[in-house]
């Protein structure tokens, strides 16, 4: 080799070899010092075929797992079916299931629904019965919706109201007939509803709000019981009493006019006696007030006040 200035040296190669060997020793020592106990050895050579195959299989399994996780249940099922047919043979028709016996939630509720649930019905609850009971609990069971299409045959259909009907006022502020939406002249009726459910005959008292035409349909064969509020009954009683008092006053006035013709002396005496009697009654009532404590008045509870308020609201 040529050195600087064109001079050759016989010791230049030996010096370079010594420096490279020292560097290798230093790197090996540094690697040993920096090596961690769980660290694997570095392969300076080409890996064995078996090791390379294991690494490839592991990487492919990881990718496949991520791919399956990204799928939903249906896509995963179709992939497995296609892989099975691809590797083991067969037809896709063998994997098709018959949908004749499939049931939706609505079918399950129709099969297990009950108009009224008793304690006996809630025994031995299956998932179908639990679903029907959950639907029943969400219904509003104050007023019913009626189907009066077969009223001439004395056949009626009743069901409870759902949330939308309660919000819209159907069955309470509008006619409770399924095919009628009138809101004038509504009357409340109480009907003894007899029905057969799951092979068992049952009865239930049902309240309905119907217009005049639908009330005629309901009472086509025999009249049902009409529900009236307490205040209306009290008003009718008061009206009857007032009319009877008016009649008695008129009759007394007529008799008094007849007696006036007979003589004024007797009328004066009667007036004096009436005035004396009224004065005596007033004095007696005043004396009775101071004899003892005031009579106790029955105070209504909060529940009774709420009941009266809701009766005026609903009827």
UniProtKB/Swiss-Prot annotation:
Tissue specificity field: Ubiquitously expressed with higher expression in brain, heart, skeletal muscle, kidney and liver.
Instruction: Please cite one Gene Ontology biological process associated with this protein.
Output: mRNA splicing, via spliceosome
The keyword Phosphoprotein is annotated on this UniProt entry: yes
Record carries keyword Acetylation: yes
**Where is composition skewed (Basic and acidic residues) in this entry?**
236-245, 268-278
Composition skew (Basic residues), residue ranges = 226-235
For bias kind Acidic residues, which ranges apply? 301-315
> Phosphoserine occurs at which residues?
9, 12, 251-252, 278, 283, 285
Subcellular location(s) per record: Nucleus
GO cellular component, as recorded: nucleus
Record Pfam families: Fra10Ac1
Region: Disordered, residue numbers: 1-28, 226-315
PTM N-acetylmethionine: list the residues.
Answer: 1
Q: How does it assemble?
A: Interacts with ESS2.
What does the record give as the function of this protein? May be involved in pre-mRNA splicing.
Q: Please state what the protein is called.
A: Protein FRA10AC1
Originating organism: Homo sapiens (Human)
